[in-house]
Amino acid sequence: MMRHLSVPRTDTSLWIEFLSKRDWLAASVAIQNLGDRRGIPLNQSAPNTIEGLPIVDLEPKLPEPKHWTDRLSVELFDQYSDFWPTANDQLGDLVILKIPEEVKDFKQEIADAILTHSERTRIVCEDKGVKGEFRVRDLRIMASRDGTKSTRTQVKEHSKKLWIDPAKAYYSPRLGTERLNTFEEGVNLAKRLSRKIVICDPYAGVGPNLSLFDGEDFVKLIIASDLNPDAVELLKLNLSGNSLISCDDAKELAKIHPEKADLLLVNLPHDSIDHLPSLLGLLGRGHEVMIRGWAIINKDMFLETEAKIKSIIKEENLIKLDITPIKSYSPQDEVIRFQIRILFAE
């Protein structure tokens, strides 16, 4: 048995700090749930009375492992301590990770440890890189909690739920802040125009750039397209009826929806700027419109990129151009955001 200080649940952190400062807190022992109170383990140095609070004898509990590698056997972990994967993606009930060559023989042990560690995980997948025309993840299922093999799952981003399938359609959770900023720019554009706006995303994927706009009062219509039919299937699940969804070549979309869009989203990082000339026909005339896009460029080509965009849009149509570095892509390249406010004559 071990002595535990019984404290009000709401004051637990305060008492942990109090005990820690006095070196009275027992190491490597878990705090216990006592209903509306918590039992904080005391070491042998702690006195028999502390601020008039009850001290109770409880069977000590080991703290829950903090990382899935803590659930591997000590001998196995120590033998390959430099090689266990330290990063993974948790997408809904999927865990996706790359397995270093040195520990490939222990995929089952890795998967079992992850399933034990994370109760919400249904499937553990090895990431073998990207494949195919649409550059989707090549996933190999290592283990499934319930025997299912589907990699379709649901994620939540800024209060919106999205159906995704990383084995069939590209999705990255790492641009959530960019998507929120895009939404705010859409709100601002609607205010400047004093009316509802039409938003077009020719490279919509499963719809992460559009989900925040879906169902909002200031949005008249969403036009969404993607060349990947599997992405379009999920896109239809993620957007409401107030949208036109198709599986079309982005460069042909202006023929289908000429001069319809107020806000155009262009997220095809390796080709975004080269595709701009064929996308301009989507934008409305006689009022302000906006392009918000992302591209990967050489870090030394910032001024050249700015000049290229201006040559495509034409100076007489340009209200404002902002180019902002977002993150490094490689030692030579970076991801940028370009935001273009335009006024085309009618």
Where are the predicted features?
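SAM-dependent transferase fold signal centered on methyltransferase-like domains
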Residues: 1-346
